[in-house]
From Swiss-Prot:
Name of the protein in its database record: Kinetoplastid membrane protein 11
Pfam families referenced in this protein's UniProt entry, alphabetically: KMP11
Main localization (coarse): cytoplasm
InterPro entries: KMP11
Upper taxonomic lineage: Eukaryota, Discoba, Euglenozoa, Kinetoplastea, Metakinetoplastina
Gene giving rise to this polypeptide: KMP-11
GO process annotations (BP): cytoskeleton organization; defense response; positive regulation of cell population proliferation
Species for this entry: Leishmania tropica
Keyword RNA-binding part of the UniProt annotation: no
Role according to the record: May be involved in the regulation of the cytoskeleton through interaction with the subpellicular microtubules. May be involved in parasite mobility and attachment to the surface of the host cell. Behaves as a strong immunogen during infection.
Length: 92
């Protein structure tokens, strides 16, 4: 059974969404484990804030890169479908 572009695209979109959701869940678990701020020294509080910012930034960058890869794969899949179509039905 041949996969259509729409099926391929929808599957990549679902995978992107699922991965993003899992990353957000992992981040939420990590942030929930942070000690109560009232027990932290100013230096440790600053450390946690920087670390949280870094995690959020890296998560955003990673999700953006995953989306870019998915779009690239969709483009390549569309090109392969066109090549296959051209091979099956060559113009005269």
């Amino acid at each position: 059974m041949a996969t259509t572009y729409e099926e391929f695209s929808a599957k990549l979109d679902r995978l992107d969404e699922e991965f993003n959701r899992k990353m957000q869940e992992q981040n939420a678990k990590f942030f929930a484990d942070k000690p109560d701020e009232s027990t932290l020294s100013p230096e440790m509080k600053e450390h946690y804030e920087k670390f949280e910012r870094m995690i959020k930034e890296h998560t955003e960058k990673f999700n953006k890169k995953m989306h870019e890869h998915s779009e690239h794969f969709k483009q390549k899949f569309a090109e392969l479908l066109e090549q296959q179509k051209a091979a099956q039905y060559p113009s005269k």
